[in-house]
Regions:
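Anionic coordination/interaction segments
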Residues: 1-228
Length: 228
């Protein structure tokens, strides 16, 4: 409860909209390997759960996207390997987005104490890494990190910028536009959104590894640089 990384709405309404989401934009068509949250009809779909892992695989218009999620034993992180394959006879220009919405740590307080919570969100971006460090400076010794193992073309860290002020994960504004806006969260609802453009020849595939991790430092070692 006190160290939740991603936001969860406890009444689960709307149903099954939260989580680590992968979006594929192929021309004007936007879809997810796991169908949710865009609910775009897929040509084929499978979901497999094993001991410590889940594999989602969807196919749309000749493109197959496979999402493999697991938590390594002994490590405080989730790894998400996404493999996109062009099974069509034409070159595909695709935009891939990986998205999570951060919880402000206390899972119960996160959905109730709005007069305070909406002023605490804080992030830092370095290359392909988004650090969620809400309250790290003030009173916490832990933070979260969301990253990709390759250069990204754009990013967002505010929900309003990625989803749109009146939008949501079912039809994100940034995905429809084909790129993120480079937003930096200062309060409100911090998120992690990473965008990568792919050009795939017929028969070509490409894999990207995304990670979501939790890091905790000893309280006395929070700041180790001189003068900080």
């Amino acid at each position: 409860r006190m160290r939740r990384l991603t936001r969860y709405r406890y009444n689960n309404s709307p149903l099954d909209m939260d989580g680590h989401r992968i979006y594929i934009k192929d021309g004007e068509t936007v879809w997810n390997p796991g169908w949710q949250p865009t609910k775009t009809p897929l040509d084929s779909y499978s979901c497999r759960h094993g001991l410590g892992y889940t594999i989602l695989e969807g196919k749309k218009d000749g493109v197959t996207a496979r999402q493999e999620l697991f938590v390594p034993k002994g490590d405080a992180c989730e790894l998400d390997r996404v493999t996109v394959c062009n099974g069509s006879t034409v070159v595909k220009e695709l935009d891939l987005f990986s998205y999570v919405e951060f919880c402000l740590w206390d899972a119960v307080d996160d959905s109730s104490n709005f007069q305070r919570n909406y002023s605490t969100g804080e992030v830092e971006v370095e290359g392909s890494v988004i650090y969620h460090k809400t309250e790290y400076r003030e009173r916490r010794n832990h933070y979260a990190v969301f990253w990709a193992n390759c250069p990204v073309d754009s990013f967002d860290t505010t929900r309003d910028a990625f989803c749109g002020v009146y939008g949501g994960p079912a039809d994100p504004q940034a995905v429809r536009a084909g790129h993120c806006s480079g937003s930096i969260a200062h309060g409100w609802a911090p998120v992690g959104a990473l965008h990568i453009h792919l050009t795939l020849a017929p028969g070509e595939s490409h894999s990207i590894l995304f990670g979501l991790g939790y890091i905790e430092n000893p309280q006395q070692e929070k700041f180790i640089a001189p003068g900080i």
